[in-house]
């Protein structure tokens, strides 16, 4: 789903159901495209959880649910909280989906204020409010995550968790995964192909496609490299030092994820006019 922009996903749903608008459609589309933000970190933690924790809890008399709540859930909580933070910040910064679905959010109001007003002060004030909201989400995530620490007693290496047969729940679980994939990836892809085939004005221009592809790859590659160079020192610092300054720097790095392109563009335009 991360490969499908939110406005493209919203456009495909609007093409299939023209009456969609408001909070519920916007919430559904943004939830579908944001699934990997939570699934990837939680899945990474689950793949590394030592089954010895659950085995010890079961030995001490805990049932499956109680054992999960006391051993596995605390290990998943930091990853789930971080994924939820990324999802919240992504939702704050989204502009395309909420605009197509006609649901007023800060990003849409900022853009409308910038286009309609001669004075850009109102847009700047709204942008500051958006940054403040992002800061609130970051602080809330830090408070919910708490001071997570983990110890392991013994010299043995951690074991990978074994696969558990789901039995009669196998097909419902598979159906749920397939349904999520269908709604988040398959449906938008099929609708895009259908719209392309139905279009009477569609003209294949290989040169334009190659140019657009090259520009996209170039922008993505340079952006990824710059982001890596900027984020790597922060990641190393956060992993090796747990003081207050490091946590502040780590939290500040998340705030940029909440800044929509329209806000960054306004800032660059204002900077260019001021120089």
Identify the residue ranges that each predicted region occupies.
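Glycine/proline-centered hinge or cleavage motifs at structural transition points of membrane proteins
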Residues: 60-62, 74
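Membrane-water interface segments at the C-terminal ends of transmembrane alpha-helices
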Residues: 1-47, 73-96, 123-142, 168-197, ...
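Glycine-rich helix-loop "coupling/hinge" segments at transmembrane-helix boundaries
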Residues: 92-118
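Active-site-proximal cofactor/substrate-binding loop regions of enzyme domains
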Residues: 11, 64-67
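Membrane-helix interface/capping residues of multi-pass secondary transporters
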Residues: 53, 62-64, 95, 120, ...
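Flexible interhelical linker loops that connect adjacent transmembrane helices
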Residues: 144-177
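Conserved MFS/SLC helix-loop-helix module at the cytosolic interface between two early adjacent transmembrane helices
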Residues: 49-59, 67
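Peri-membrane helix termini and adjoining interfacial loops of integral membrane proteins
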Residues: 101-107, 148-157, 193, 197, ...
């Amino acid at each position: 789903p991360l490969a499908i922009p939110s406005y493209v996903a919203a456009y495909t749903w609007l093409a299939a159901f023209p009456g969609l608008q408001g909070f519920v459609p916007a919430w559904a589309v943004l939830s579908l495209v944001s699934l990997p933000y939570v699934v990837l970190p939680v899945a990474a933690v689950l793949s590394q959880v030592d089954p010895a924790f659950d085995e010890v809890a079961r030995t001490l008399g805990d049932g499956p649910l109680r054992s999960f709540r006391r051993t596995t859930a605390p290990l998943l909580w930091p990853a789930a909280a971080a994924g939820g933070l990324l999802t919240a910040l992504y939702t704050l910064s989204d502009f395309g989906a909420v605009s197509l679905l006609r649901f007023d959010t800060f990003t849409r109001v900022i853009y409308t204020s910038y286009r309609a007003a001669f004075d850009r002060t109102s847009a700047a004030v709204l942008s500051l409010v958006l940054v403040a909201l992002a800061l609130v989400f970051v602080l809330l995530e830090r408070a919910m995550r708490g001071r997570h620490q983990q110890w392991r007693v013994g010299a043995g290496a951690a074991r990978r968790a074994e696969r558990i047969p789901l039995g009669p729940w196998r097909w419902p679980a598979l159906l749920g995964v397939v349904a999520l994939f269908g709604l988040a990836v398959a449906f938008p892809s099929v609708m895009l192909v259908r719209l392309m085939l139905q279009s009477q004005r569609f003209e294949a221009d290989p040169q334009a496609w190659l140019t657009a592809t090259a520009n996209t790859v170039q922008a993505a590659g340079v952006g990824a490299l710059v982001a890596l160079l900027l984020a790597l020192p922060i990641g190393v610092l956060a992993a090796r030092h747990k003081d207050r300054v490091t946590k502040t720097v780590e939290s500040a790095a998340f705030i940029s994820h909440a800044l929509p392109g329209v806000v960054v563009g306004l800032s660059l335009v204002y900077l260019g006019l001021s120089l």
